[in-house]
Amino acid sequence: MAFIHLDVGFLYTLLVCTAFGSMLSNAEIKVNPPQDFEIVDPGYLGYLSLQWQPPLFPDNFKECTIEYELKYRNIDSENWKTIITKNLHYKDGFDLNKGIEAKINTLLPAQCTNGSEVRSSWAETTYWTSPQGNRETKIQDMDCVYYNWQYLVCSWKPGMGVHFDTNYQLFYWYEGLDHSAECTDYIKVNGKNMGCRFPYLESSDYKDFYICVNGSSESQPIRPSYFIFQLQNIVKPMPPDYLSLTVKNSEEINLKWNMPKGPIPAKCFIYEIEFTEDGTTWVTTTVENEIQITRTSNESQKLCFLVRSKVNIYCSDDGIWSEWSDEQCWKGDIWKETLVFFLIPFAFVSIFVLVITCLLLYKQRALLKTIFHTKKEVFSHQDTFC
């Protein structure tokens, strides 16, 4: 028994010493942060490259495959984006209206340390575009609409208090273009560039679309404005057309319309229907181009509806409602309205003809009476001479 007790005690001591030795060994292992960490702007209007070089390693760790933990954000953001990578660079889009900060450390995996993972200290860097011009000189009310998923149009207003000689230029870039491009079809107001009609944009969907609008003036520097869009989220479709309203029976009504023309697939639409029954209006939505509704009263005399469309959540995160379609209506008791429509003018004309006839008859009677009275006087004179 004493031998067994001694053996267990020895094993316990050995385990404690091994664990302590391993902890001591790991505590002594240190790894350096990556070198030459920087943010590089290749001129893509906000699509930046974060890049670095491997840290300096002791010879016994050179065969280890290390990873890097990268964190970055715009300076006014509360949340960091975190990336774990084995590469020496990472690219992402940023709002260049604000500053950017990033930090990175080295992760030495557990298999290289015979223990737990080892992290280096952080290497940090920041990036700002070169500031120029007062904030008030930036354009205002930038508005971009991707009409029918085919034609992109952007418009803006001039900055506050800018000199009359100020003019603006728009540049854009998205992944697939070799370099940023300038607008070739400006919308002009009083000779100044206040918008842009873009050319056909090939393969531009579901990726960041970067825009910069800067300006020039001989009187003052103009601060540029930067924007990032996802084009599928600013699509404004055409309104639906060929609406039909069918009253099936005393209660059921069928509303139907054609999907908007253009390249947008049928599965990508959601429709908003505004239905009016005798002055009472309600609104509903559907992803189909047909809907059945129930009349609130089978004695309702007028039913009307109109429809508009938008790209739904299956094809985009957001969208812009189209204009409303033309209104389509149904009216009950149409024979009564038809009779009233024709009866009133007919009655008016009949009364008018009757009055004219009476006047003519009265005039004719008066004329005959005058002629008869004249003839009677002539005959009286002839009797006297005889």
Swiss-Prot record:
Expression sites by tissue: Expressed in kidney, placenta, liver, skeletal muscle and thymus. Expression was not seen in whole blood and heart.
Transmembrane segments: 339-359
All ranges on the Extracellular side of the membrane: 22-338
Signal peptide: 1-21
The keyword Membrane is assigned to this record: yes
Membrane-related topology note: Single-pass type I membrane protein
A molecular function (GO) term: cytokine receptor activity
Protein family per UniProt: Belongs to the type I cytokine receptor family. Type 5 subfamily.
Cited function: Cell surface receptor that plays a role in the regulation of IL-13-mediated responses. Functions as a decoy receptor that inhibits IL-13- and IL-4-mediated signal transduction via the JAK-STAT pathway and thereby modulates immune responses and inflammation. Serves as a functional signaling receptor for IL-13 in an alternative pathway involving AP-1 ultimately leading to the production of TGFB1.
Name of the featured protein: Interleukin-13 receptor subunit alpha-2
Organism: Canis lupus familiaris
